[in-house]
Each structure stands twice: as C-alpha cells, then as structure tokens.
Amino acid sequence: MATLPILDLWSTNKALVSLTISASLLLVSLLVSLFQVGRRERGLPPGPPTRLVLGNEHEIPKADSHFLMSKWAKQYGGIFSLKRFRNTTIVLTDWKIMKELVDKKSTNFSHRPPSKVADLITRGNHILMMQYGETWRTMRKLIHQYLMESQCEKEHWKVQEAEAAQMLHDFLVDPENHMKHPKRYSNSITMSLVFGIRAKSVNDEYMTRLYSLMEKWSLVLETGATPPVDSWPLLQWIPERFMGYWRRRATEVGDLMTGLYTEVLHVIENRRKAGIYKDSLMDRVLDKKDKYRFDEHQLAFLGGTLMEGGSDTSSSLILAIVQAMTQYPEVQKKAHAEIDSVIGTDRSPAWSDFRKLPYINMMIKEAHRWRPVLPLGVVHGLATDDSYNGMHLPKHSTVILNVWGMHMDPDRFENPDAFIPERYANFPELAPHYAALADGAARDHFGYGAGRRICPGIHLAERNLFIAVAKLLWAFEFKNNPAGKNDASAETGSSQGFMHCVKDYDAIVTVRGEERRQTILRELEQAQTVFAKYD
C-alpha cells in the first residue's frame, strides 16, 4: 500500500510529460507553419524576394501601385507572382499571356477573389465585383442585349449625338467648366438609356452625387489602400483606429452607393405607378420583374453599376484627349485637317462619318493606351489550379491585369510616354474587333479589360468617344493656358484610386469661327426632339 503514492506521482508526471510533449509538438508545428507564411512556394512564377509572414505585402504602396508592378515586370517577366501573407497574386504584363490565360481559359479566370471591403460596400450585388455565377450571368446578359452593337447602331446613337450637341453648346457658353462638360455628356447618355432620365446640366443632383461617390469608391478599392484582411482574416479584429478605419470607410461608401442607387430605382418605380413607361433598360427589367426575381438591392445595383461604368470611363478619356491637345498641338492640327477635309462648317461630325475620320479613331486608341482609366484593370480570381509554361497557378489566386505595364512597354511602343496617335495607323476597326482576335499581340489596347469580364458596354463606349472627340475637335481649338495649372505627367497628373482620371487642368477653349458657332446653336435646337423623350 505504501507504493501507491509513488505510482500516483508517476502517473501524474507521465500525464504532464505527455501534455508537455504534445504542446511542444503543436508549438513546433505552428512555428513551422508560421515560417511558411509569406514564402513563395516552389513552382510559382518568379517574383521579388519575400519576407517571413509578410511575403511582399510590405512593398506594395497604398497608391499608384501600377508603377511598381510595371517595374517588377521588367525584372521578373510578363507573368510573376507576389505573396501577400498566405495568399498568392499573379501579375500579368504580357499581351500573349493575357490572351492565353484570361481569354482562352475564361471559365477559370472569370471569378473575383474574395473581398471583405467589396462585400461591405455592395453586399455582393455590384456586377463589377460580383462572383461568377448565375446572377452575374443573368445581369450580364441583360446588359449585353441592351447595349449590343445592333442596338447602338439602330437606336442609341440618337441619344449620343443629341447629348454631344449639348456638350458643344456647354463648351461654347461656359468654357471655364470644361472639366465638367464631358462628365455631364457621358452621364446623361447613360442615365437616359438606363433610367429614361437626363442630366440636363453640370449641376444635376444625381450626377454630382455619383462622381463624388466614385472618387470615394475608387480610393477604397485601390490595390494596397486597405489592410490585407482577406489575406490575414485576424486583422479584422484589430481596432480600426490602428488600421486606417478601413471598415468605416467601406461602410460609408456602401451607404452612399445604396442610397443613391435605391433612390433612382424608386423614381423609376413611382414613374411607372403613375402610368409613365419609357424604353429604358430598367423599364424593360421591371416589365419582367417576376421572371428575373431580383430583390430591391440587386435591382438598384444593376442600374447603379451601369450608371457608374457609363459615366466615368468615357468622360475620363475625353478629358485626357482634350489635355493631350493642349500638350501636342501638332496632333490637334492633324485632327483639324482631317475633319475639315470631310466635314464643312454647316454640320458637325456624326457617327456615320466614322470611316471617313480614321485619325480620330487613332487618337481614341492612343488615349486608352496613354491614360488608361483602370491601370491595373479589375482583379480576377482563379477558381481551380492552373498552369502556364510549367509554372503553377494555384486556385484562389488573385490575378492582376497590369494594363499600365503593357501599354507602356517600350519594346512595343517607342517613346511610350508621348501621345502619338500614328501608332494605331494599322488599326482601323473599333476595339471589339481586336479583342476578339485569336492573337493577343494583335490587340489594340486593354482599356476594356479581357475575357468574359470585358466591359459589356464596349460598343456604346466606343461610339461615345468617337462622337464626342470628333465633334469637339470640329468645333474648338484647345490651347494650354500658361497662367494656369496643367499637369500632364503620368506620375502626378492623375487622380489616385483604382480608377484614374486626369486632375483638373486649365485650358483655353476657342470656337473655330462664327459659322461653327451658329451650327452648334442650331444642332442643339434640333436635339430637343430627342431630349423630349427623357425630360
């Protein structure tokens, strides 16, 4: 009996030893696992050296990361990888690789990576950020059917030319507000077609709220602007004051977005209750509301997403072209000469003049290349494991389309920082033609994205740009104002965020003669019959 305490002691010690060994093994396992975090796994595309746990996260700037991505592409090639804690990011900066992966393997590359910030803002209902699935396909089909090329050729050009007529008048009578007129033009086209509502002036409430919202949305979504809560979920629980108030910023943008888009939807619904129906996209959707079975938030974001896409991209490129005219007068002179050889002073250019004005088309393509609205595109996500040229591309990787790096490649574009429309002398067609070619190197630019996520409004946007630029250069001469500000630098002259637009600049706007002035006034009067459908 005296030996029992000894046995009890041994039994207790044995349990403690076992527990200690188990805890030690667990600790070693955790340490080994931790030491793997941030490391580039064997088989991944090459990339910059990583740090323990962080990977490359510490190197990614909060703004303008496309410059660093392009620098890395020169060092590591057209496909390279980054580690952001546990997550892998694949960066594509090669025209052919882009085609081989994003276009030809579009089923795998059409997803979006998980985004806590995007979900907080949109609840998953923004088609730009929406996961690839049935709802996305339904919305995409609706947009495509309404904005397809045949619809643009048959109907939409009338609204575009009428709104361009007002834009010319706005430039004529209010040249000091030249930064706002292209925004009203593109916004009003979109509002008319999507909702049956015009933006009559640069002070339109919905337009003003939208562009303010887009600035905030763009800043929140820029690569590097938000703590990597998707890569390291534990960061969600750190007090926001130590993390740049990321959740608060996202929630504020989401509230503004939901408020605006829902308000516009209610205007349409109330109009229909009053017995007023218009041939807008949202009217068509509401006609078949039971078929599509969208909830209110989805309906609001379907229209709101189109309001965004149709307003911001076209106006940003028009403003970039006008700025280029103040910096490259020889280009403007060539454009004037081409227009004057085809169009007189008794009418402004129309969409039907497209084939007669190839230099204008070259200018638009060069603007896409020179000042892309989305320098890093919109991130894609890999659904399953994939590979390229022996390199492993793991599922759930984030895929960045480095549009800036491709557009500024000196091996493809001599003197890439300069605005030289002649680069596109052998590209007479519109952008959709080149996006559909099997050879990725034959594409004109990546301004509209790639794969199944390519901009569904591409046909409308191409016509927006041609009509606006041709009419503006027919009507006006744009000169640099030496007494004002005009920063045309790629590094400092554009806004920050995932969407870029040139910063406000001063310009001298001069109408090209009295006959053109009278034509502008007359064509605005003629446009009233089109406006009457939407007022």
Curated annotation (Swiss-Prot):
Null mutant phenotype reads: Abolishes the production of terreic acid, but accumulates (2Z,4E)-2-methyl-2,4-hexadienedioic acid, a degradation product of 3-methylcatechol.
**Origin, by domain of life?**
Eukaryota
- For this protein, the Enzyme Commission number is 1.14.-.-
| Heme is among the record's keywords | yes
Q: Which cofactor does it need?
A: heme
Binding residues for heme, per the UniProt record? C455
| Matching InterPro entries | Cyt_P450, Cyt_P450_E_grp-I, Cyt_P450_sf, Cytochrome_P450_fung
Keywords annotated in UniProt: Heme, Iron, Metal-binding, Monooxygenase, Oxidoreductase
SUPFAM superfamilies reported in the protein's UniProt record: Cytochrome P450 (SSF48264)
Q: Which reaction does it catalyse?
A: 3-methylcatechol + AH2 + O2 = 3-methylbenzene-1,2,4-triol + A + H2O
Metal-binding as a keyword of this entry, yes or no, is yes
Q: How is it used?
A: Terreic acid is a metabolite with antibiotic properties. Terreic acid also acts as a selective inhibitor of human Bruton's tyrosine kinase in mast cells and other immune cells.
State any single GO MF term.
monooxygenase activity
Pathway assignment = Secondary metabolite biosynthesis
- Pfam families membership: p450
For this chain, the family text in UniProt reads:
Belongs to the cytochrome P450 family.
Biological function: Cytochrome P450 monooxygenase; part of the gene cluster that mediates the biosynthesis of terreic acid, a quinone epoxide inhibitor of Bruton's tyrosine kinase. The first step of the pathway is the synthesis of 6-methylsalicylic acid (6-MSA) by the 6-methylsalicylic acid synthase atX. In the biosynthesis of 6-MSA, atX utilizes one acetyl-CoA and three malonyl-CoAs as its substrates and catalyzes a series of programmed reactions including Claisen condensation, reduction, aldol cyclization, and the hydrolytic cleavage that yields 6-MSA.
Descriptive protein name: Cytochrome P450 monooxygenase atE
**Record organism:** Aspergillus terreus (strain NIH 2624 / FGSC A1156)
